[in-house]
Amino acid sequence: MSQLHKRFTSEQLKELLDRYLKNEIERKYTQEILGIRKRRFFVLLKQYKDNPQHFTVQYRRTRAPRTISPMTEQNILKELSIDKKIIQNKEIPLKSYNYSYIKDRLRVTYHQKVSLPTIIDRAKKHGFYLKKPKRTLHDREVLTRYAGELIQHDASHHLWAPASQEKWYLITSLDDYSRFMLYAILLKTETSWAHILALQTVILRYGLPYAYYVDSHSIFRFVRGRDSLWYKHHLLTDETTPQWKQVLQDCNVKITYALSPQAKGKIERPYGWLQDRLIRTCVRGDVKEIKHAQRVLNHELYRYNHQQVHSTTQEIPYLRFQRALTERQSLFREFTIKPPYQSVKDIFCLRMDRTIDPYRRISINNLQLKLNHASPGKTVNLRIYPSTIEVSEIRCWSEGKLIDVQRIKNTDLKGVHF
């Protein structure tokens, strides 16, 4: 209901109060006509009785309303226009305006302080407003009580920097309890090795978590009927172990799979804030190179981890994470190399088995390697660690012993899927 002074003139109000005082109309009917409560009614009645001649309900503004400058107005509309173009681009995974981002951008870039309701008001007036779709419930929730109880790991393939005209992969790892982002990197190609490097970075820095939570991507899980068209299906789901999964098995870390897109949605929602700002900043910065985009990502990652209060936990992720570690509310364990292995290169690596021929050689596709201390007929387990872009270190294990170490050009390892 609108304000009293907008619905009644002072004279109309005087008449109603005067009739009440003369017992011509009961209070409850007067209140209903005016649309006010008992307390407000008696406040007005007292004011009328104290000064009937000068009684008024007309609102008098004591100071001019706050307004924004034309330049600020122009910048708001400029930023809203950029967002509109982003939303209209079907290649970009953004479907709504982010008024909070625009508020932050006005403050940081233009040094203009504007309230969020003001930005939303201008958006509605100038056609930069979309109704939010109703959220659908997902069929699984992951609830954790400890840091390291569950690490949400994901990869998203999108046009993060539209000016580059190239889609990149964003690989991320996030602690479910604290919402602290442990790892984030942009890559042009997604490989098993890229995900293994993510494991190595997180585990060596923070320790071994209790479990990882991922989708059923072929890098994380072999699924019958999907991952090999020529396969005769003698193997069922999970009877073939992907490289990434073998690393976690060596580390004694459990894996939990999201069995539906709805369940996986819980993984993706915490990343939404980071992804949203990454795209909007790359658009405004005309970012074309992946190295430049990574710098933008690092900046937004720091802001997310150390400055932003998370909407779910109502805490800054870094502070919540550190408090959990300090108070021993953590399931992270110290990483140690599993015997008989000697180096992290034996754990965070690609693996394959070969049989040593009578000439103490093995073959990797068309590449033949002669091994030292090899026994013909024995099986050798190759642990391949890409040391650089050009060279990989192959560590050869047989019967629990490291029998040889060789360095090979990656171009010679054709057929090995990094």
Residue positions per predicted region:
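Short, basic alpha-helical/linker "hinge" immediately adjacent to a nucleic-acid-recognition surface
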Residues: 2-7, 27-82
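Residues that mark the N-terminal boundary/hinge immediately upstream of a DNA-recognition element
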Residues: 25-26, 98
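DNA-binding alpha-helical recognition surfaces that contact promoter or target DNA
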Residues: 43, 104, 117, 121
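Short, basic alpha-helical nucleic acid-contact segments in DNA-binding proteins
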Residues: 48-52, 112-113, 121-134
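A short, amphipathic alpha-helix used for macromolecular contacts
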Residues: 63-115, 156-161
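Structured nucleic-acid-interacting core domains from mobile-element enzymes and related host factors
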Residues: 138-151
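RNase H-like DDE/DDD metal-dependent nuclease/strand-transfer catalytic core used by mobile genetic elements
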Residues: 149-170, 176-292, 405-412, 418
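C-terminal, beta-rich DNA-binding module of retroviral/retroelements integrases
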Residues: 305-418
